[in-house]
Amino acid sequence: MNCKIVGYEFKSLEVILAPGETFYGERRSIVYVDAAIQREVEFNATSNGVAGKLGGIVKSALSGESILILKFYNPTSTDKKIVLSGSCCSLFPIKLQGESLICRKGLYVASTNKLQLNINLTFSGIIGGFFQKMTGEATVFLDSFGTPIEKHLSVGEVLDVDENH
């Protein structure tokens, strides 16, 4: 799989899927997809069964993400292209290696593997609200206003971040 951010002022994500590869994206992020790419709608749920799906629906509604996520699959013998974009002007890739990322709700655009998407409710100081928590092993592409600031926290270190940034 080859992922490349293209564009100058308004960024898009070009994904070349080799035969047999999969990719995940937010339903509203599609710009265009080669016709041969199979798309499968999956529930954004962390567990199976009715209770897991209902929990996924509630979490999705609170986190600002779609209840459904798209799984793209290339069933052909040649490379195929997907182009995705966020609603803002920039995309920011972050590689997760089994750890969690907490960010503003609604920023998830796509990922190289399926992630566990949850809500993170925060009541810290005067700032509180619903944030989104992503956990798994994937490169995640987030919607971004301007240039993001990446901050790795030490054990026990805490930052108060306004939910609008």
Which residues does each predicted region cover?
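Phosphate/adenylate-binding glycine loop and adjacent helical scaffold
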Residues: M1-H165
